[in-house]
């Protein structure tokens, strides 16, 4: 394996970093259960990756649907609490410091089995996941009911394939 092509062509570095301060308000709330911080979006990283802090603040509510992505990997790093991680074969309790990498096509899901929990979620390459998260938030907030076909269309539009 070799290094990828150069992305910066200047002879000297530049001041271009972006700092996210802990304690910042979430960028999005999905119902009473999830708060999402957009740390680095696919757009802000030039499509290299998307990184989000996902805080599950509400009580657990059922088992989430397992799914996979065709265009990107997804990784989870547990920050606090217990995150239930499904690796396509079994559920495991992820504790702070635990990490799960899921390549494209890998079946996965997550939940908070025992109360509040936080994790970092990384998509690579970066994709416009914010649009998907925001549509989910709108559906939850409005109480809008989707047909099975509408759910399928939403999922497929955002590279999410339920199993």
Predicted regions: what is each one?
Residues 132-163:
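Acidic/histidine-enriched, glycine/proline-rich intrinsically disordered or flexible terminal extensions
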């Amino acid at each position: 394996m070799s290094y990828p092509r150069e992305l910066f062509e200047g002879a000297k570095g530049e001041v271009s970093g972006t700092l996210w301060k802990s304690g910042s308000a979430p960028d999005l709330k999905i119902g009473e259960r999830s708060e999402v911080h957009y740390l680095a979006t696919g757009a802000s990283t030039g499509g290299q990756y998307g990184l989000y802090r996902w805080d599950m603040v509400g009580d657990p509510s059922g088992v989430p649907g397992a799914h996979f992505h065709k265009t990107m990997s997804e990784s989870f790093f547990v920050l606090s609490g217990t995150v239930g991680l499904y690796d396509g074969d079994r559920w495991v309790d992820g504790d702070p410091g635990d990490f799960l990498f899921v390549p494209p096509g890998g079946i996965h899901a997550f939940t908070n089995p025992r109360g509040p929990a936080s994790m970092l979620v990384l998509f690579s390459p970066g994709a416009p996941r914010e649009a998907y998260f925001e549509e989910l938030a709108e559906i939850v907030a409005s109480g809008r009911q989707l047909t099975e076909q509408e759910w399928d269309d939403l999922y497929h539009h955002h590279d999410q394939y339920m199993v």
